[in-house]
Amino acid sequence: MRLVPASTLVARCKKPARPSRTVSTAMAALVLATLAVGCQAAGTGAGSSPAGTIIVAAIPGIDDAPLYVAAKNGLFRSAGLDVTIRSFQSVSQELQALNSGKVDIAEGDYADFFYAEAASPRPGLRIVADGYHAAPGVMEVLTGPHSDITTPQDLAHKTIGTPEPQVIPIQGSTPYSLETVATQSVLANDGVTSVRWKALPSQDLISALAHHQVSAILVQEPYILEAESQLGAIEVLDSCSGATASLPLSGYFATESYARRQPDALADFRSALQQAQANAVLPGPEQAVLAHNPGMSMQSASLVTIGAYPTTLDAASLQRVANLMFNSGVLVKNLLDVASMTGS
């Protein structure tokens, strides 16, 4: 769930019959932390890092905000770790850097990393920590304010714009991703089994809806906020509801070989990260980053819907994602055993 330029986020349009989207000041500050904390650009490197030194690949966004807070507030240093965060543009770039040893840990979408693991001829990835879970309003199918689509059933045979997949290849006419897999599950429960997908760059989805190139768009926050603000877009379906409620969205991964060599460093990293995740809903040092915000207003940040930051690593919870992928046909050979990736 990646941040759009802060300057594009303006006062949010309020929608009827929806719970309040306002979050605490600390939570808003947590969103802004990814913008205020400097990241090193992705670069070259060789081999694995020395003991106690960890290089983390991340695509700055809402989901990995606690990573930046932990770094800024010295939680990693207190754990005896020297953590460097390198920013990347895509999960595919992260995976390449992870597998080549240029980074030690990579944060990203569960569906992409699970697909990469399932496609590998031998086990290669380990889950270091759980990162981010869905909550109501973080992933939605939206239509324009004057659309005749008002219910999930109205989406049958319509074209839905969705972000281009980063790792999973398009199969048939479906651009599989965690977004489309979750949405298909909710649609099926509503009796809708046939929709058309149109994969587009994330930054083009709102324009496509505005110019009627698609009937609806499937987006996560903060694009939901942007679509509502710019177009008055209306929610038709919450993709993380019912069977997909509280769905795990992203996590932190290392290679199996690195996890075997550096178990203590990974345990210390997970502990420090979970401390930042646990403090995410409490007033605290996160508020200090607001003074250094390069563009997002406090009002806009407080209107972004934020999911949950888990403080434990539960293989059974993460297995829900693998099950969705298998049932939808993304994992065509075998059901991925997530517990084997956690050491549990």
Where are these predicted regions, by residue range?
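Bacterial N-terminal signal peptides that target proteins for export
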Residues: 3-27
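C-terminal motif of bacterial Sec signal peptides marking the signal peptidase cleavage site
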Residues: 34-38
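Bacterial signal peptide processing site
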Residues: 40-43
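Short, glycine-/small- and polar/acidic-enriched structural segments
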Residues: 47-199, 215-221, 235-238, 246
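Pocket-lining segment of extracytoplasmic ligand-binding domains
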Residues: 111, 147, 198-288
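Short, solvent-exposed loop/beta-turn-alpha elements that line the ligand-binding surface or hinge
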Residues: 133-134, 241-244, 307-315
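Secondary-structure end/capping motifs
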Residues: 260-330
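Conserved C-terminal helix/tail region of periplasmic/extracytoplasmic solute-binding proteins
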Residues: 325-344
